[in-house]
């Protein structure tokens, strides 16, 4: 008798999880996980004032108990994914965060996350978001971003991810600016 209750409970949990995942991602199809092609793909270019092994790291990142594949970048670094073909109805889905160990440390003033695209002739900035969990508790989580790329459908574009250590017109302050781009992916919305 106990065994049948356990089986029923397991089936209900699996069904509930499947329904949750279906409704959560309904109408969205992932075209390319950018973390999967980082860091060895020939299409990626990394620019930083720090050595590459210090400036960038791909792997699981946990923010407020939620783990996502991510790309850690020190501030004042740039990561370029070259010649990514943008699909019809394409969007960049990404989650921004500053690592938890920076939240309580003194001196941090957050990270400026910038994202844009370029066809090699012109750069279009599509995201400019300051995340400052040390001074803004609402930023102590993954900050979801959905960036419409449909204006570039069918084109091969460079996807350019930048992190800066402070806002414009502020003195540079790289203290505790542990920036993470969480689960960056090109998705198609239906």
PLM feature spans:
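Gly-Asp-aromatic-enriched flexible segments
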Residues: 17-190
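N-terminal Sec-pathway targeting helices
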Residues: 1-12, 19-21
